[in-house]
């Protein structure tokens, strides 16, 4: 509907506001009505439904109209309704009503608040007013509107909050605090900040000045638990006992089954019952005396079957302990903390503070409060080969107890024997000195093993055919123990550690051991020698050795075994020195031919025999062993495992010489085999031709006999005139047969002569060819020897020109680099040859010993040609070719 219309129809229970523009006054027109608008009037809004407040509802109107005592609306002189500005009016259920100009619906129609049982509204007065009972209410007053009921709002009253009642269950209490001075539900006066408990079961609605802090649950107490409490301030508890600030006490099930801590009680915790069995005891520190106070510094011992609670301030020393039940092999070391007396009657014994004594089983023992158990001792079982070190604490003397079960006395303690770190490491390894002596240490870190019990007697099992030296520093003497035996060290005894050389070449202090093996055994060494013609060679020698003792019971004789700490290094150095001296006086060629003999004589030396030679002089004979008198070491044999040139050029020249000798021998054998095959072929062919001629002769002879028989038969058959003719014919046939036989015989003789001539010719041709081949081979051998001499002379002149120092520097630089290169490649043995050259490995040892062809059986000399050994050099004269580290091919 447009506001400019002149006729406005107002339905029932609707209203409009009309503004008189002349007087600027607004009024209300209520329907049902048809209102005709004047020209000076303006409709402010279309018809609006009146406000209808249903039952149990209310609304709030701001700036309400003023009414008189009869409820009539008041108007001012201008005709404008009079308003109560800045005021509020709460209107409850009534007939529909319009809003006058200036009135504002502050709060829409709202249901009245229903307050349920156990619920209250916390109200506060905003203005001073008088309630319906005529009592004056001052602004700021607070009170509760408790249910059940319906709360009628008032403009002077503000609803702060809704308060719910708190349900207090069994074994619960409600903790309250006063916000200001007031009276509680029981009528007791409470001051501001005071706290108290409400223990009554049920719903509790706090008063307006009561503040609910929390619900306190009761602590359920049993026979095994108690409640530890402490007073926050002076007060009287629920049982009427006066408590002081800081006082602590226990509440047990004998006092109450469920305890609700008061507001002045602080719960320190729940204490469990302490239960002792028949074999338990405990020591209580600072026990509570009859006056209820802790006796500081005192102790109390409880034993046996009982249960109790530790009072506040009491504590257990080391908790609940078991009664010491001692067997025959057990004991207790005790110490007196205070003077005390033990026993009864004549067995009464007094102890001063600090005394130590030992009690032995079997018994049950509970230490009194004045006695401290230092330790529980057990008898130490010892076998015949076991022992312990015991030290007397009074005298300080240490002794070893071996072979019997032993319990320490009160004045004895176990003594730890310290060993040098090297000895500890050797004992912890647990290696067999005989079986594991060849193992190399892959790492410097020792393997983790069980640490040695230092109180146990140190034992070491000496293997068979070995010896161990033990030195007593107290007696200042040594003893030697031969295996198999078990060595037990005394308190002042120590092992003699041997530091031996090992490796190839020998490195000093490479192996440490406690026992000395007596042999027989062997060790290997690598030495570098130089011949008279400055040829440097590397030898790998192996020596068999053992120790000789005339009397093992003689201390001086046995002490000689350990007089040389490193017998391996000492022997290797001595032998290497002898070998270098012997080889330095011979040339390379002589050493190559007689290397084994030279080395053996250098190592073992010579001795004079009774046998006299033709010149009436004693012939020196090589010894068969070398003896070191310092320690009785005997070297019984020496094995030359390898001989290898150090200089690369020497090695190459030797290799070429060996290859050339192999080629010459191969060519010679090939020519001899070819000649033998041709000779055998010619002989077979001659025998075949001769057999053919003999067969033809036999055939002709048979034919002649056949003809004779035919002639005889013809003569018998023919008679008469035919006899002469037959005889003539027979004679002619006979003559013809004889001629044929003679002709065949002559042919055979001619063929035989021709064959023999051919054989003679072929034989002479072959002999000439063989002589030619032999001369050619001899020329080649001579050429090779002359070339070798030229090479040797050239090498000698080059050596003299370069000088020993330059050659030594060159020789050291090259081989070391090549050896390192081969070692980095992981090669352990090397042989350089081609695929078509055979190598004889059967005569290696003979060629190594310098025997060569003398030790070989003589070869069968083939018929028709010279022997290979007559025209060629022996293979054994060639230089040895090293195969790996242990074999030499001559």
Curated annotation (Swiss-Prot):
Residue windows of the MVP repeats: 2-56, 57-111, 112-164, 165-217, 218-272, 273-323, 324-379, 380-457, 458-520
Keyword field contains DNA damage: no
Region of interest (Disordered), ranges: 425-455
Entries under InterPro entries matching the protein: Band_7/SPFH_dom_sf (IPR036013), MVP (IPR039059), MVP_rep_dom (IPR041139), MVP_rep_sf (IPR043023), MVP_shoulder (IPR021870), Vault_2 (IPR041134), Vault_2_sf (IPR043179), Vault_3 (IPR040989)
Numbered residues of crosslink Glycyl lysine isopeptide (Lys-Gly) (interchain with G-Cter in SUMO2): 444
Compositional bias segments (type: Basic and acidic residues): 434-444
Cell compartment(s), UniProt: Cytoplasm; Nucleus
Post-translational modifications reported in the UniProt record: Phosphorylated on Tyr residues after EGF stimulation.
Gene Ontology terms: cellular component: cytoplasm; nucleus; ribonucleoprotein complex
Pfam families for the chain: MVP_shoulder, Vault, Vault_2, Vault_3, Vault_4
Primary location: cytoplasm
Keywords assigned: Cytoplasm, Isopeptide bond, Nucleus, Phosphoprotein, Repeat, Ribonucleoprotein, Ubl conjugation
Function of the protein: Required for normal vault structure. Vaults are multi-subunit structures that may act as scaffolds for proteins involved in signal transduction. Vaults may also play a role in nucleo-cytoplasmic transport. Down-regulates IFNG-mediated STAT1 signaling and subsequent activation of JAK. Down-regulates SRC activity and signaling through MAP kinases.
Subunit structure, interactors included: The vault ribonucleoprotein particle is a huge (400 A x 670 A) cage structure of 12.9 MDa. It consists of a dimer of half-vaults, with each half-vault comprising 39 identical major vault protein (MVP) chains, PARP4 and one or more vault RNAs (vRNAs). Interacts with TEP1. Interacts with PTEN and activated MAPK1. The phosphorylated protein interacts with the SH2 domains of PTPN11 and SRC. Interacts with APEX1. May interact with ZNF540.
Domain comment quoted from the record: MVP 3 mediates interaction with PTEN. MVP 4 mediates interaction with PARP4.
Name of the protein this chain belongs to: Major vault protein
Annotated organism of origin: Bos taurus
């Amino acid at each position: 509907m447009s506001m400019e219309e002149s006729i406005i129809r107002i339905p029932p229970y609707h209203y409009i506001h009309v503004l008189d523009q002349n007087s600027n006054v607004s009024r209300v027109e209520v329907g049902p009505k048809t209102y005709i608008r004047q020209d000076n009037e303006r409709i402010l809004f279309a018809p609006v439904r009146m406000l209808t407040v249903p039952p149990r509802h209310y609304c709030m109107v701001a700036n309400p109209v003023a009414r008189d005592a009869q409820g009539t609306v008041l108007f001012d002189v201008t005709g404008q309704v009079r308003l109560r500005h800045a005021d509020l009016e709460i209107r409850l259920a009534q007939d529909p009503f319009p809003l006058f100009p200036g009135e504002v619906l502050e709060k829409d129609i709202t249901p009245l608040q229903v307050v349920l049982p156990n619920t209250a509204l916390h109200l506060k007065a905003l203005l001073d007013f008088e309630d319906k009972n005529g009592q004056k209410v001052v602004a700021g007053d607070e009170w509760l509107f408790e249910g059940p009921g319906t709360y009628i709002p008032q403009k002077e009253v503000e609803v702060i909050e809704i308060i719910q009642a708190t349900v207090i269950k069994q074994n619960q209490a409600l903790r309250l605090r006063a916000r200001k001075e007031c009276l509680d539900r029981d009528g007791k006066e409470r001051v501001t900040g005071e706290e108290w408990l409400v223990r009554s079961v049920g719903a509790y609605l706090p008063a307006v000045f009561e503040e609910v802090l929390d619900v306190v649950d009761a602590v359920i107490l049993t026979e095994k638990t108690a409640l530890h409490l402490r007073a926050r301030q002076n007060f009287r508890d629920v049982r009427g006992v006066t408590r002081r600030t800081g006082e602590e006490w226990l509440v047990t099930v004998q006092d109450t089954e469920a305890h609700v801590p008061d507001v002045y009680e602080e719960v320190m915790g729940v204490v469990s019952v302490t239960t002792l069995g028949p074999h338990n005891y405990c020591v209580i520190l600072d026990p509570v005396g009859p006056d209820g106070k802790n006796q500081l510094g005192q102790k109390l011992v409880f034993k046996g079957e009982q249960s109790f609670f530790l009072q506040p301030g009491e504590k257990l020393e080391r908790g609940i302990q078991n009664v010491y039940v001692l067997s025959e092999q057990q004991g207790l070391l005790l110490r007196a903390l205070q003077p005390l007396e033990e026993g009864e009657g004549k067995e009464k014994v007094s102890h001063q503070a600090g005394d130590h004594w030992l009690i032995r089983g079997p018994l049950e023992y509970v230490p009194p409060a004045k006695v401290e158990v230092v330790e529980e001792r057990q008898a130490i079982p010892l076998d015949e080969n076991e022992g312990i070190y015991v030290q007397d604490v009074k005298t300080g003397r240490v002794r070893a107890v071996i072979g019997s079960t032993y319990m320490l006395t009160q004045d004895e303690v176990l003594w730890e024997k310290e060993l040098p770190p090297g000895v500890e490491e050797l004992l912890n390894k647990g290696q067999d000195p005989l079986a594991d002596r060849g193992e190399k240490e892959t790492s410097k870190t020792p393997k983790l093993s069980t640490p040695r019990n230092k109180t146990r007697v140190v034992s070491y099992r000496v293997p068979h055919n070995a010896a161990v030296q033990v030195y007593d520093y107290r007696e200042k003497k040594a003893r030697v123990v031969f295996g198999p035996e078990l060595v037990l060290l005394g308190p002042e005894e120590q092992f003699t550690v041997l530091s031996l050389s090992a490796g190839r070449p020998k490195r000093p202090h490479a192996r440490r051991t406690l026992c000395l093996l007596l042999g027989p055994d062997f060790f290997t060494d690598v030495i570098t020698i130089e011949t008279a013609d400055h040829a440097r060679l590397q030898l790998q020698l192996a020596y068999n050795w053992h120790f000789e003792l005339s009397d093992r019971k003689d201390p001086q004789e046995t002490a000689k075994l350990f007089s040389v700490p490193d017998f391996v290094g000492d022997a290797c150095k001595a032998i290497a020195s002898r070998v270098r001296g012997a080889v330095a006086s011979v040339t390379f060629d002589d050493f190559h031919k007689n290397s084994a003999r030279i080395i053996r004589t250098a190592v073992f030396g010579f001795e004079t025999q009774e046998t006299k030679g033709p010149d009436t002089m004693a012939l020196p004979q090589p010894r068969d062993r070398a003896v070191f008198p310092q320690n009785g070491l005997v070297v019984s044999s020496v094995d030359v495992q390898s001989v290898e040139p150090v200089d690369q050029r020497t090695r190459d020249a030797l290799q070429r010489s060996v290859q050339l000798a192999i080629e010459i021998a191969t060519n010679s054998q090939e020519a001899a085999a070819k000649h033998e095959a041709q000779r055998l072929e010619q002989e077979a062919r001659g025998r075949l031709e001769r057999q053919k001629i003999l067969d033809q002769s036999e055939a002709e002879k048979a034919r002649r006999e056949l003809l004779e028989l035919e002639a005889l038969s013809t003569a018998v058959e023919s008679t008469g005139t035919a006899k002469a003719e037959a005889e003539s014919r027979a004679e002619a046939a006979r003559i013809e047969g004889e001629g044929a036989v003679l002709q065949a015989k002559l042919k055979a003789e001619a063929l035989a002569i021709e064959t023999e001539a051919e054989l003679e010719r072929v034989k002479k041709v072959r002999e000439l060819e063989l002589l030619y081949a032999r001369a050619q081979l001899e020329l080649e051998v001579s050429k090779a020897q002359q070339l070798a001499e030229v090479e040797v002379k050239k090498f000698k002149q080059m050596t003299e020109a370069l000088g020993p120092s330059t050659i030594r520097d060159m020789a050291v630089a090259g081989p070391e680099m090549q050896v390192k290169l081969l070692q980095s490649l992981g090669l352990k043995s090397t042989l350089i040859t081609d695929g078509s050259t055979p190598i004889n490995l059967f005569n290696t040892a003979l060629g190594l010993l310098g025997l060569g062809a003398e030790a070989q059986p003589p070869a069968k000399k083939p018929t028709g040609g010279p022997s290979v050994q007559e025209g060629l050099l022996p293979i054994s004269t060639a230089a040895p070719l090293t195969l790996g580290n242990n074999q030499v091919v001559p």
